[in-house]
């Protein structure tokens, strides 16, 4: 099965860094150019090509449709539309959002991963560290997340690492889709 476009949702509490991560992955910005965060209104779709992804032993280019979703619950009425055709979910939280993150991520995982019957391999959690002393160990998640890959990211010191982690995640999504196709 040839997948040429993937619909990936980026979800998480407000002010966790979703838009900055989406912009960085799509190469819309250099991290040095990132201004102060502004709340996303509803959803913002960023499209870009991810080259040289290994699919069944062959390198291919994958078009990514990254849906940068607002963390504001006043847009919750849009959730059913966002979920249509979803093939993967990136959950994002940061040290500044850990207080609300546990409950919020559980809600988002249930609605956008469990209910549309995505596998845990089609989900990843990015813990957006804003400085080098931040530690993913400070995030306490339920057993729901035991099979979900959890990755600490730091755009300021490890942006290239994020791109590698993202490519690995996309490979995982493609493998899961091919397994259930």
Language-model segments: residues:
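TRAFAC-class small GTPase G-domain
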Residues: 1-181
